[in-house]
Amino acid sequence: MDNLQTLFDHLYQGKPLTREQMAQVFSTIIQGDMQPATMAGMLVALKMRGETIDEIAGAADALRQAAKPFPRSDASKQSGIVDIVGTGGDGHNTINISTTAAFVAAAAGAKVAKHGNRSVSSKSGSSDLLSHCGIALTMAPDAASQCLDKLGLCFLFAPHYHGGVKHAVPVRQALKTRTIFNVLGPLINPASPEFMLLGVYTLELIEPIAQVLHALGVKRAMVVYGSGLDEVALHDNTHVAELKDGVVRTYQLSPEDLGVNRADIAQLTGGEPADNALITQAILQGKGLPAHRDAVAINAGCALYISGICDSVQAGTQLALATLASGTAFTLLTDLAAASQAGEHNE
């Protein structure tokens, strides 16, 4: 164990920390043992230099190790599970594309454990939307695991599993700037998914985050930046860093590559959680606007590809479109709402 002050001095001098040293620093944060001023200085020092892959992985290690355990069945370990998640912070108040896509991917055969939170930077985060769809956020881990096995989908509410992160909230709010915490959320899913479709808020992050996912043991992933969006874009090209067989390759995908027509980003503008819940329900019933349907389908399609359900993103998108037309994804939403109410865990 290194002396913490020595580690802080390293950071203030612009020197990187090892993965193990960073895990030690973040363990101190989530135990509530770091002074706010020290935490602020550390977060800003990291931001000014730029976090390394080892530092991000080490911070994620600490948070994952401290999380409330999520029990995985043998069946889910054999099939593998996928998360569809974004860092947020892209500045566009769109409809809840990744959350809606999670229902579609699950209805099409993937096992989806979506890790989400209430909104920080937009009007409606995934958990805000789910509440309005009648889905209880505080399911006991055992009940959520059963939903994953029986329905192919569960939602894991971040504060329910990561209680220690609350110690950083006042400092993050006071700093009013992005810090390493903005990229940690998608990396600390307590279900430890083997596959990930992860959207980021800037192009510069796609390759480093793909390398972090590899370091954390993720088998296959697409880290995407959709021309201003933290998801696969319908309005323009999407930059992709794909992790497969331990190798990261980068490329671009256009909406046309995915088999859909591009649409202006204004067509994806969302509203308050109640509005977005109605939009999601319409999409899942096969009654959504064409741009809404296609935006959800291309994201669900990429998730179906990386989880091995489909051999290409194009095939995944076609399966997602067929699933939306069938209405089975809406049935899944109602089934999950009923199961979540039964499995709610009040603390």
UniProtKB/Swiss-Prot annotation:
Cofactor: Mg(2+)
Coiled-coil ranges per UniProt: none
GO BP term, example: L-tryptophan biosynthetic process
Gene3D superfamilies: Nucleoside phosphorylase/phosphoribosyltransferase catalytic domain, Transferase, Pyrimidine Nucleoside Phosphorylase, Chain C
UniProt-annotated binding residues for anthranilate 2: R172
Residue numbers binding Mg(2+) 2: D230, E231
Enzyme class: transferase
UniProt protein name: Anthranilate phosphoribosyltransferase
Organism of derivation: Shewanella frigidimarina (strain NCIMB 400)
Organism phylogeny: Bacteria, Pseudomonadati, Pseudomonadota, Gammaproteobacteria, Alteromonadales
Gene that specifies this protein: trpD
